[in-house]
Swiss-Prot record:
HAMAP family per the UniProt record, alphabetical: ATP_synth_gamma_bact (MF_00815)
Record's bilayer topology term: Peripheral membrane protein
InterPro entries in alphabetical order: ATP_synth_F1_ATPase_gsu, ATP_synth_F1_gsu, ATP_synth_F1_gsu_CS
Name assigned to this protein: ATP synthase gamma chain
Length: 286
């Protein structure tokens, strides 16, 4: 049985750990509130640009643009959004496991059939260790990234599609459902074959021409899909870390309660033993 000193040391150590996890939970909760606002505030912009693109696509059937046209798929590109830091429950492992399984099933790990663009240090390290074909990466993004932080990568991804480096582009990330629920999501970024909206489209007059507008607008729309997924993923990351730290804090408190009970029992046993020895000694003197 552990000594009173050992039990007391474990209690103090666990209390310090619980203080750290509690602080991390509070920090993550604060970051989550801002990340939620960032993700929500970007949605109207993304919806409006989709509306304009849909209006052009539906109103001008003769327009031919490479980003709108499907082509035979010989190679597929994947954008994978993960985090730079851990301690976020299954946030990274869920999306990485999904992507790994998809690539094994669809491409049998043949690097000539796929390529990966990865965001986040943990995702990069995981995929590199397992021999996946990574062609671009971004690490060190802030907890609240701006569009500028991701624009270069998104532009490169779109340019590679236009240059024929791959024939379709998917993005994988954790979609934020609620503070306790996030789900791995796959979205097709390119080609933009489903830009049509179910909502009634507004009639626009375009100057100089619809074709010229699309040349500018389509890359911006594709970039907005990447950025929107990143904001969504960041909200999921903070939510997952907050939940993980709360669970760790709760577990630590349970351990402290159990150790405190063991400490009290051990101390009671020690006191009982001392009393027994005193009584026994007194009886021997009589």
């Amino acid at each position: 049985m552990a000594s009173l000193r050992d039990i007391k040391a474990k209690i103090n150590s666990t209390k310090k750990t619980s203080q750290i996890t509690k602080a991390m939970e509070m920090v993550s909760a604060s970051k989550l509130n801002r990340a939620e606002q960032n993700a929500k505030s970007f949605v109207p912009y993304m919806e409006k640009i989709q509306e304009v693109v849909a209006s052009i696509a539906q109103g001008s059937k003769g327009i031919n643009h490479p980003m709108l046209n499907a082509r035979p798929v010989k190679r597929t590109g994947y954008i994978v959004i993960t985090s730079d830091r851990g301690l976020a429950g299954g946030y990274n492992s869920n999306v990485l496991r999904t992507v790994s399984n998809v690539i094994r099933e669809r491409h049998n790990m043949d690097s000539n059939q796929y390529s990966i663009i990865v965001l986040g240090r943990l995702g990069r390290d995981y995929l590199k260790r397992r021999g996946f074909n990574i062609i671009d990466e971004v690490v060190g993004l802030s907890d609240h990234p701006s569009f500028t932080d991701i624009k270069d990568l998104a532009s490169r991804a779109i340019a590679m599609f236009a240059d024929g480096a791959y024939d379709e582009l998917y993005i994988y990330y954790n979609h934020y459902v609620s503070k306790i629920s996030q789900e791995v999501t796959e979205n097709k970024i390119l080609p933009l074959t489903d830009v049509a909206s179910d909502k009634p489209t507004t009639a626009y007059e375009f100057e100089p021409s619809e074709e010229e507008i699309l040349k500018v607008l389509l890359p911006q729309y594709a970039e907005s899909l990447v950025y929107g997924a990143l904001l969504d993923g960041k909200a999921s990351e903070h939510a997952a870390r907050m939940t993980a730290m709360k669970s760790a804090t709760d577990n630590a408190m349970e351990v402290i309660d159990s150790l405190t009970l063991s400490f009290n029992r051990a101390r009671q046993a020690a006191i009982t033993q001392e009393i027994t020895e005193i009584v026994g000694g007194a009886a021997a003197l009589e």
